[in-house]
Amino acid sequence: MLPHQEVYREGMRCFTAAHRRLEWLAVRVLLYTLSGEEKEIAYHPSGKPYLADDSASLSISHTKGYVAVVLGLPGREVGVDIEQYGERVRKVAHKFMREDEQPSVFRGTDTWSLLLHWSAKETMFKCLN
């Protein structure tokens, strides 16, 4: 799966929660699968990830055991966000929805629309910042 597995085992030790270790490793597996080679992920002071060799732009998202990785052309920002379906989104909707934005009903509930709004805005934020 990944060459130099001892390096990845060492990196996983930074996390105490098992699900965070798996997410961290899954990001590296996806990155290796997409690029065909090992890539070092570095982080800006803001926490935004990037490839240390600047061979591509990078965006990462993870939630509850799922991860997503997107690569783009060097210097062209990309963004990705994944969210797990859940009613919790209603409790935080005021943080990402303006008063003049109304979620539509999709699949019989507005939960999907709220999640779509949240994820779309998070993706754009990652692209622009």
Regions found by a protein language model. Name each.
Residues 1-129:
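Core catalytic alpha/beta fold that binds nucleotide/phospho-ligands
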